Amino acid sequence: MNNKNDELLLEIIQNKQFKQANIKELENLEFEWLIDDFLVKQTLVMIYAGAGSGKSYFMLYLSKYLLDSNKINRIIYFDADNSIKTLKERKGNEFLKTPNFYYYFSNNIQKFTLFKDMQKAKDLNNTLIVIDSIRNFIQDDFNKDFTMIKIFDELQRARDNGATIIFLHHQPKQNQDENNKAYKGATTFLDSVDEGYFLHKKDTN
């Protein structure tokens, strides 16, 4: 860039603090699988299912596995969906005995600014953040894309600061024998994540 217009454009870009793509960085970048063909480190992931499908239970076991196998250094689990009684019924004390498993009941009004504040943490490497469930942390209408884009921008910045983030989400109510695998809310929920998984409770009969 060598003329005045180019210099102005460069100044605008620099003031926006955008990061220029670096060829060497791209060539040296390797994907690190936390679980082969399922979970990549430093990604934003949605896991959604109907009520009673075992989303939270699944995340407790997954979290414990990742810590026990030294895939990550710590887990920060934010729960605004379940009660302490529910956690006890799920034998939560056995999961929480795992070192560096931090579990927080997040049921006050401060939860609505969690994502905005979380992005300020600059070093979240080797950290798994679990959001259970995301609808409980959103004060705005989560059916509207223009309100959800801001929420996901905040989550993406936390991911870019090193975190692996998994949030749990719900489905609309459906007939028991029918499931179209739809999730609640705006298309942003799937558009703005690295991966989205539908969790189905296997029939053991």
Kindly give the residue locations of the regions a language model identified.
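OB-fold nucleic-acid-binding modules
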Residues: 18-23
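Walker A/P-loop NTP-binding motif
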Residues: 61-70
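Phosphate-binding/switch region of NTP-binding enzymes
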Residues: 46-47, 52, 56-57, 61, ...
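Short, small/acidic-rich helices and loops at N termini and domain boundaries
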Residues: 1-13
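Conserved inter-motif catalytic segment of the P-loop NTP-binding fold
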Residues: 12-13, 26-30, 34-35, 40, ...
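Intrinsically disordered, low-complexity regions of eukaryotic proteins
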Residues: 8, 81-83, 196-197
